[in-house]
């Protein structure tokens, strides 16, 4: 049975939901698009909790009615009693499931969960093979995003000398992108025979993934004096003019040493805007990392640290196996590389929620 504290929390959520519903119908709110969007978003974030609470209330009433029926027929009708007991058991199981779901729905929410992201993939140890592996990861995340109905765009790219990517930044936009992909941050290790390996020996290479929530100018303020910008001729889109006009932008943030090189847009202005967007995301991620480091010193969670240096996964081609070290669980390699990440990601979310519940209790 749900605790009095849980029920009180749910009643407060329900009251807030009803208040937001009333405000949405206010003519004054309807004339303010920004306020209308804010209220609609806040209401939407509570909808699943309220609907589940209503389902729990209905089921609890049914359970009480069944208990009363059981008391009435206990000695008169053995067959009806057996049916009532079976139904009562089913209702109790369902009630327990709903209470567990409601507890999870009331967990503190990450304010970044609904945001779009910049997903950065950098080749790590392993030379040219690491660059090829980084490109494979970029393809994997692109496939996953497409399956989720999200849009993917290459925001920045530095190619390897023999192919692959030294560094790639994907801009991924859609519903709840950060909430799904934030657990992908860390070191991804691959064990396979490189195409350049004549002896058939297995090599180990790595690539590092960073997941940066998209932020606006209000959330991260950058002093123009801290920025140094150089331009260069682009090797990207642009047809015959590609090497005649300096459209590429090389941006340096002097206080942190962060450098962003953008060539993917057609004009210098667009590349400059894109570089600033990436810089803001990188600075915000640094702030998140600092916050997470202070939290991690107080608790040690298997998932959710988001550290670039944490080895989270090994992809073993010989055994057709992917091992997630946080979950201590194996998955088939080929579906994962084709973007079938949902089972793995949901498992990470489940573990994170379980650890958060344990910490709160």
UniProtKB/Swiss-Prot annotation:
Modified residue annotations for N5-methylglutamine: 240
Protein biosynthesis is among the record's keywords: yes
Compartments in which it is found: Cytoplasm
Superkingdom assignment: Bacteria
Keywords: Cytoplasm, Methylation, Protein biosynthesis
Main location: cytoplasm
PROSITE patterns, sorted: RF_PROK_I
InterPro entries: PCRF, Pep_chain_release_fac_I, Pep_chain_release_fac_I_sf, Prokaryotic/Mito_RF, RF-1
Pfam families found in the cross-reference section: PCRF (PF03462), RF-1 (PF00472)
Record PTM: Methylated by PrmC. Methylation increases the termination efficiency of RF1.
GO molecular function, one term: translation release factor activity, codon specific
Gene Ontology cellular-component terms listed: cytoplasm
NCBIfam families in UniProt: prfA, PRK00591.1
Biological function: Peptide chain release factor 1 directs the termination of translation in response to the peptide chain termination codons UAG and UAA.
Family: Belongs to the prokaryotic/mitochondrial release factor family.
Protein name listed in UniProt: Peptide chain release factor 1
């Amino acid at each position: 049975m749900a605790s009095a504290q849980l029920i009180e929390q749910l009643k407060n959520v329900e009251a807030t939901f009803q208040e937001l519903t009333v405000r949405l119908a206010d003519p004054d709110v309807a004339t303010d698009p920004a306020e209308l969007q804010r209220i609609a978003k806040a209401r939407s974030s509570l909808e699943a909790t309220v609907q589940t609470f209503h389902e729990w209330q209905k089921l609890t009433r049914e359970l009480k009615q069944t208990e009363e029926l059981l008391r009435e027929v206990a000695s008169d009708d053995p067959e009806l009693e057996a049916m009532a007991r079976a139904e009562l058991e089913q209702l109790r199981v369902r009630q327990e499931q709903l209470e567990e779901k409601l507890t999870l729905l009331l967990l503190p929410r990450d304010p970044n969960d609904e945001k779009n992201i910049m997903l950065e993939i950098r080749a790590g140890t392993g030379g040219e093979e690491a660059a090829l592996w980084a490109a494979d990861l970029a393809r994997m995340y692109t496939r996953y995003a497409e399956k989720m109905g999200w849009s993917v765009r290459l925001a920045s790219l530095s190619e390897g000398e023999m192919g692959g990517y030294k560094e790639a930044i994907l801009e991924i936009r859609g519903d709840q992108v950060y909430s799904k992909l934030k657990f992908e941050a860390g070191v991804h290790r691959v064990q396979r025979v490189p195409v350049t390996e004549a002896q058939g020996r297995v090599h180990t290479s790595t690539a590092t993934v960073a997941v940066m929530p998209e932020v606006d100018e209000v959330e991260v303020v950058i002093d123009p004096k801290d920025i140094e910008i150089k331009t260069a001729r682009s090797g990207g889109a642009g047809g015959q003019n590609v090497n005649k006009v300096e459209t590429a932008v090389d941006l340096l943030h002097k206080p942190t040493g962060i450098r962003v090189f953008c060539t993917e847009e057609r004009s210098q202005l667009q590349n400059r805007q894109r570089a600033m967007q990436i810089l803001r995301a990188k600075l915000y991620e640094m702030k998140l990392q600092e916050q997470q480091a202070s939290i991690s010193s107080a608790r040690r969670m298997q998932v959710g640290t988001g550290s670039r240096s944490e080895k989270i996964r090994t992809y073993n081609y010989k055994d057709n196996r992917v091992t997630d070290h946080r979950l201590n669980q194996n998955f088939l390699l080929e579906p994962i590389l084709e973007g079938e990440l949902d089972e793995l990601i949901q498992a990470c979310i489940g573990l994170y929620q379980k650890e958060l519940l344990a910490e709160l209790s």
